[in-house]
Amino acid sequence: MKSTFEAAGRVAKGMLKDPSKKYKPFKGIQLPNRQWPNKVLTKAPRWLSTDLRDGNQALPDPMNGQEKLRYFKLLCSIGFKEIEVGFPSASQTDFAFVRHLIETPGLIPDDVTISALTPSREPLILRTIEALRGAKNATVHLYNACSPLFREVVFRNSKQETLDLAIKGSKIVTAATKNALESKETNWGFEYSPETFSDTEPDFALEVCEAVKGMWKPSAAQPIIFNLPATVEMSTPNTYADLIEYFSTNISEREKVCVSLHPHNDRGTAVAAAELGQLAGGDRIEGCLFGNGERTGNVDLVTLAFNLYTQGVSPNLDFSKLDEIIRITEDCNKINVHPRHPYAGNLVFTAFSGSHQDAISKGLKAYDERKAVDPVWKVPYLPLDPHDVNSEYAAIIRVNSQSGKGGVAYLLKTNCGLDLPRALQVEFGSIVKDYSDTKGKELSIGEISDLFYTTYYLEFPGRFSVNDYTLSSNGPQSKCIKCVVDIKGEKKDTPSRVVIEGVGNGPLSALVDALRRQFNISFDIGQYSEHAIGSGNGVKAASYVEIIFNNTSFWGVGIDADVTSAGLKAVMSGVSRASRAFAK
């Protein structure tokens, strides 16, 4: 079966070598004294969620009544005060849902305004008002397309006919709402969209909106909403901002007007367009959670909110339970949030790169040390503290063949309590990289800790291990050790056991002397460090010892409830690793 385009002779051929023959650049307006580039965002806009209307109509499987109600409750819990609840004149499901919201006590919070969209046609306008009647606060959202393309190709209307359509619709809305006795129990608002605004002649858009305003007669206390959509994103964000500033500075009675922005994301810059549009005079933004909507989506309200939040400006929306919000959104929309989605994707707080991991690890440590006196968040690669959205730092660093020592060390410290010396981080980081290369996949923290315990003989003994020992003094600065050592051969049989003795200025040097005497093994101890793991009765000691054998460094690790035993185990761990390396 042929597609619509094929049936019309529109067969795919590929990209043109000279696209200028087919596509023309968007022409902006001349605004030589534009003011928006000199401004900064210092407060949140009014937000409207259109998930239940613009978002829902774009879903392959639109939400049913139960899903809509679940989503509405989610939006209220986040803090949205304006919610577009549907297109009741076009859908009986939407009509029934709006009536259910209004007729069920307590579903709509007193401070929440619901709105519904309607074309500028009398039967549809009246049906929409019928759906909204009885709500405490309701906005009728009227629209008609005004751009040349839609006037000439879609509707075949002149400018005057387009203007008359907007005026007629506004008269009907006014008569049936704030001027109607049966509608007095509702606080009515009015929103008008010159649809396809960004492709409409700016002066014509102003002319239409002035006429609509004259019908509604707004006040400063109850302004009319002029929603200025980039119905299809056709230009760079600065061009949209110019259009908004031109409209905002030229509409009369500006104090009686709320300028609302409604960018779509066809060029991938809806967020930027919304932010620049705010600088240019926008008071309100319409969009969807995670950018749902027609084609490439509406502007993403989550990204906009966190962009403000991470600049120290409260968005007046609460996304603390972001994982739960994502889960409900995915359940209702049946579309997954992309793993790279700003702020919300399951990989946005994740670093695989070694250099990134090292910087994050150091940044988190520095922040933890200074946050009591300087709480300002400054951590490389993380514009948002994961704790602010109930996420854990443990999820930040994940390990594959691209990872480095810093990430591996961070995971071992946060999950196992092991604070590796830098040189040991380098050694084990290389081991992890080789192991991940062999496996060809990301390693879990369980796999990393298992590899660490196996490599350094913490789970099972290496070739040499201490079975028992006694220490005695041989003068004020000398220790004698008598140590029972198990020696494991190549075959997995019972290890042989010998008693060795040595003298040194401490337990570790005494063990080194004993190994040299018994086995003719000559090596030095390089770096040594230790720290406690845990606290209280269950505290253990972790010891790290660098063995220098034939000018080669081998690290050993020991963990024990006794500090001395941990150090001796670390020496044997290093010696076992050295003997294994040189036996190959």
Curated annotation (Swiss-Prot):
Name this polypeptide is given: 2-isopropylmalate synthase
EC annotation from Swiss-Prot or TrEMBL: 2.3.3.13
GO MF annotations, alphabetized: 2-isopropylmalate synthase activity; metal ion binding
Entry-linked CDD domains: DRE_TIM_LeuA (cd07942)
Gene name for this UniProt entry: leu3
PANTHER family in the cross-refs: 2-ISOPROPYLMALATE SYNTHASE, PTHR46911
Quaternary structure and partners: Homodimer.
An example Gene Ontology CC term for this record: mitochondrion
Reactions listed under catalytic activity: 3-methyl-2-oxobutanoate + acetyl-CoA + H2O = (2S)-2-isopropylmalate + CoA + H(+)
Cofactor(s) required for function per UniProt: a divalent metal cation
Record pathway: Amino-acid biosynthesis; L-leucine biosynthesis; L-leucine from 3-methyl-2-oxobutanoate: step 1/4
Ranges of residues in domain Pyruvate carboxyltransferase: 45-323
Top-level taxonomic group: Eukaryota
HAMAP family registered for this protein in UniProt: LeuA_type2 (MF_00572)
Protein source organism: Schizosaccharomyces pombe (strain 972 / ATCC 24843) (Fission yeast)
Keyword Metal-binding included in the entry's annotation: yes
Alphabetical keyword list: Amino-acid biosynthesis, Branched-chain amino acid biosynthesis, Leucine biosynthesis, Metal-binding, Transferase
InterPro entries: 2-isopropylmalate_synth_dimer, AIPM/Hcit_synth_CS, Aldolase_TIM, IPM_Synthase, LeuA-like_post-cat, LeuA_allosteric_dom_sf, LeuA_N_DRE-TIM, PYR_CT
Family: Belongs to the alpha-IPM synthase/homocitrate synthase family. LeuA type 2 subfamily.
One GO process term, biological-process aspect: L-leucine biosynthetic process
Function: Catalyzes the condensation of the acetyl group of acetyl-CoA with 3-methyl-2-oxobutanoate (2-oxoisovalerate) to form 3-carboxy-3-hydroxy-4-methylpentanoate (2-isopropylmalate).
Record: residues binding a divalent metal cation: 54, 262, 264, 298
